[in-house]
Amino acid sequence: MEQMLLVIAYSYLLGSIPFGLILTKLFTKTDIRKKGSGNIGATNVIRSGSKILGVITLILDSFKGYLSVIITINIFPEYFYLSCLMVFLGHVFSIWLKFKGGKGVATYLGVLFAFDFILPAIFVISWSVITLISRYVSLGSIISSFIVLLYNFLVYGFNNSLIFFAYFILLIITHRSNLSKLLTGSENKINL
């Protein structure tokens, strides 16, 4: 029980680190939550004018997902899936931001790297194609997470796909405002 609580705590707290907010406050003296979509993630950092900080945010948000899961695999492997979930929830519901946060895509990508390198490659390639064609980051993220789920189901079966199904549902939930905007034609496109 103590081990499970420890995994919940460090995974959630690691996920809660708001790198987008920290970097923009540190280097631009602005609060990213008051710019663009108000989101703390890499897409909003990029849209708000700092591509370099956006890329660094993407890397750090991904790394916290990867690190949390790798620690758990090596120390408490029986709580592997719990760590996958808690690091994501930490990012989306950060304790440091009054339980608000990002959409979780970069953290999800980092978790994929902890599984193997095929899954993030599938995600990044499909995300790139969908986003380049549609110019909607949200659409690329949701469809790509479904493609990862489908691949995992076909290759590894039902039981190993449950965490990816959970991520797919969670990403739909975190992108619900984007989905509404897509349906009404008011979703912002990204300039590439």
Ranges and model annotations:
Residues 20, 69-70, 96, 132, ...:
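Membrane-embedded alpha-helical segments of multi-pass transporters/permeases
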Residues 7, 11-16, 20, 24, ...:
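Alpha-helical transmembrane segments in multi-pass membrane proteins
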Residues 23, 34, 42, 46, ...:
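Acidic (Asp/Glu-rich) catalytic motifs at the cytosolic membrane interface
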Residues 21-53, 176, 180-192:
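Cytosolic, membrane-interface loops and tails of multi-pass inner-membrane proteins
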Residues 30-39, 97-107, 136-144:
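Short, non-helical or kinked segments that cap or interrupt transmembrane helices
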Residues 20-23, 91-100, 127-134, 176-181:
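C-terminal ends of transmembrane helices
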Residues 137-144, 156-166:
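Loop-to-transmembrane alpha-helix initiation sites
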